[in-house]
Amino acid sequence: MARLIDQFERLPGIGPRTAQRLALHLLNQPQEQIHQFADALLAARTQVGQCQTCFHLSADPECEICRNPERRNGVICVVADSRDLLALERTREFHGRYHVLGGLISPMDGIGPELLRVTELVQRISNEEISEVILALTPSVEGDTTSLYLGRLLKPFCSVSRIAYGLPMGSELEYADEVTLSRALEGRRPV
Amino acid sequence: MARLIDQFERLPGIGPRTAQRLALHLLNQPQEQIHQFADALLAARTQVGQCQTCFHLSADPECEICRNPERRNGVICVVADSRDLLALERTREFHGRYHVLGGLISPMDGIGPELLRVTELVQRISNEEISEVILALTPSVEGDTTSLYLGRLLKPFCSVSRIAYGLPMGSELEYADEVTLSRALEGRRPV
């Protein structure tokens, strides 16, 4: 029991009390349910790998998005990780392909471009016919650094754009922080 | 005492308990302090009016921003109210002039452009030499409607732009709502 609680506690966002509650809940479930849980854990770990093209999570050598013939070729959206890719998919606004970098450049943490899937991205751009690369990276120092780096690197090959930073929908100017408001002013667009 | 508590309770964001605490606090202050408070209240109400040019709050016929010779002429930033103007001033990024509309177009609430200071804005644009109007309105249905209306109205006279809508600084793609993320994608800019 203590071992199970300990395992739950290692998960992000789960403290000792929640871990205990989850463990106790599972102990009250039928044997079969526990087996299914354990199986799902093992299967996920062994079967889910990375798409060999875009590096999104995938059980097959090529992920569903890369295989989908209805998605537009020629436009690649670059994201830091699969979570960001899934967030963009939820908008149903982007119909091109993706490339998962596997992180952001962060000199403070010793993460340089060589630790990310940058070479693979350049290779894709030289092999496929790419007209636009959209950088969808977080508005942070690391995101800015990575966007700047990739922008310089890729501009000779195709047009490079970056998602907009500014006021989020439904927000009030009055409560926006100054950096966001400055960026929104700076990034103004013709009506 | 009850009357004072009642007055405080009418203020936005102040409930009965806070109102009581404020009233009790004031009763413990020296007589002089209470007089200064009352004077400030009366003076604000009688002396603070609107700038005749931009309609920002001002004790004089022309506000400090309109009088300031160091601010750039030719660029007008249009805001809904003085609170939004003050938020933009805090960024120290905008050095032009302002125009306070006095609200946003809202057909649901029966607020049409004739109730806002639109005629005054058009007049300013035809009298002064204006090269750009920046619409700094909230990202909402009302803000969008007003931006669309003003965009069509003013485009024959000068270039009209709108502040950027997208991811706020320091936010995570993963937690952004879908509409904000869609707008950020749509509003992407060349790197």
UniProtKB/Swiss-Prot annotation, chains A, B:
Transmembrane segments: none annotated. One of its GO terms (molecular function) is DNA binding. Keywords: DNA damage, DNA recombination, DNA repair, Metal-binding, Zinc, Zinc-finger. InterPro entries: DNA_Rcmb_RecR (IPR000093), Rcmb_RecR (IPR023627), Rcmb_RecR_Znf (IPR015967), TOPRIM_dom (IPR006171), TOPRIM_RecR (IPR034137). CDD domains: TOPRIM_recR. It comes from the Bacteria. GO terms for biological process: DNA recombination; DNA repair. May play a role in DNA repair. It seems to be involved in an RecBC-independent recombinational process of DNA repair. It may act with RecF and RecO. This is Recombination protein RecR. It comes from Synechococcus sp. (strain CC9605).
